[in-house]
Amino acid sequence: MSVTVPNDDWTLSSLSETFDDGTQTLQGELTLALDKLAKNPSNPQLLAEYQSKLSEYTLYRNAQSNTVKVIKDVDAAIIQNFR
């Protein structure tokens, strides 16, 4: 996996923010699935759709968290090597 650095002034926060558009889309889909499920909680298809959307959202957030953590760890290792 490679990460393309957009410019010299990027930060971990800006890297994390690149995930925000996808997160907003997934959050909207998750909310819609939950609203449908709340109207008919005994429908197994709606439950499966909600669980699927929740899983997608969780995986996306984990990818965001892991990406930022990996970059942070690499940066920390570089700093440690300069000491």
From Swiss-Prot:
GO CC annotations on file: cell surface; extracellular region; type III protein secretion system complex
Domain of life assignment: Bacteria
One Gene Ontology term of the molecular function aspect: identical protein binding
Keywords for this protein: Plasmid, Protein transport, Secreted, Transport, Virulence
GO biological process entries: protein secretion by the type III secretion system
Localization of this protein: Secreted; Cell surface
Residues forming coiled coils: none
Variant or mutagenesis effect after changing L47 to A/D: Can form needles. Abolishes IpaD/SctA surface presentation, resulting in a noninvasive, nonhemolytic strain that also completely lacks secretion control
Pfam families tied to this protein: T3SS_needle_F (PF09392)
Database matches in Gene3D superfamilies: 1.20.58.90
Quaternary state and interactors: The core secretion machinery of the T3SS is composed of approximately 20 different proteins, including cytoplasmic components, a base, an export apparatus and a needle. This subunit polymerizes and forms the helical needle filament. Interacts with the needle tip protein IpaD/SctA. Interacts with the export apparatus components SpaP/SctR, SpaQ/SctS and SpaR/SctT.
Protein role: Component of the type III secretion system (T3SS), also called injectisome, which is used to inject bacterial effector proteins into eukaryotic host cells. MxiH/SctF forms the external needle filament that protrudes from the bacterial surface.
Domain comment quoted from the record: The helical filament defines an inner channel with about 20 Angstroms diameter and has an outer diameter of approximately 70 Angstroms. Deletion of the last five residues prevents self-association and yields monomeric proteins that allow biophysical studies.
Family: Belongs to the SctF family.
Name this protein carries in UniProt: Type 3 secretion system needle filament protein
Organism: Shigella flexneri
Name of the gene encoding the protein in the UniProt record: sctF
